[in-house]
Amino acid sequence: MTVADAKKTADQKMQKSIETLKADLAKVRTGRAHTGILDHVMVEYYGNPTNLSQVANVTLIDARTIGVQPFEKKMVAVVEKAIREADLGLNPATQGELIRVPTPPLTEERRKEMVKLVKSEAEDAKIAVRNIRRDANESLKKLVKEKACSEDEERRAQDEIQKLTDKFVIEIDKLVVEKEKEVLTV
């Protein structure tokens, strides 16, 4: 491993932490309906747990209602049950082959809970980024011990990794501010 490898690995891992945070924040419900709410719902399809998007067409009907249309008629009841049991606080209603999923408006108390959840997810992401920084710095120390790089190179690389860490922490903070605004908007 070289100094460049250590920096590249740290950058890739930090980017992955950001992607994970974005995915986690997408699961957090806001006052508006969006199809991302149902992205992680799993449906029993021919004995296998399958992602909802694989067995049904998920669309927005209006600002507060999601429409789910299974590709097969026999899947309507199964999909409705999966949505109901997904612990999202949603109560789907079937109209023929279309399942309407109204998203109830969030109470003020629930909004505050969501903001706490968002902040908790962000803190986890920051911890992950800092752990990646620590691992990268340890890799650099090993390189110095193995005489693969000088102490000056190590210091420069540590500074660059710190700048990288700061950049990703700022990005996490921006994502949190956006999501909080989204959650608190009535």
UniProtKB/Swiss-Prot annotation:
Keywords linked to the UniProt accession: Cytoplasm, Protein biosynthesis
InterPro entries: Ribosome_recyc_fac (IPR002661), Ribosome_recyc_fac_dom (IPR023584), RRF_sf (IPR036191)
GO cellular component: a single term: cytosol
Localization of this protein: Cytoplasm
Gene Ontology annotations of biological process type: cytoplasmic translational termination
A Pfam family the protein falls into: RRF
Family statement drawn from the similarity comment of this UniProt entry: Belongs to the RRF family.
Function as written in the Swiss-Prot or TrEMBL entry: Responsible for the release of ribosomes from messenger RNA at the termination of protein biosynthesis. May increase the efficiency of translation by recycling ribosomes from one round of translation to another.
Record-linked HAMAP family: RRF
Protein's name in the database: Ribosome-recycling factor
Taxonomic placement: Bacteria, Pseudomonadati, Pseudomonadota, Betaproteobacteria, Burkholderiales
Primary gene name: frr
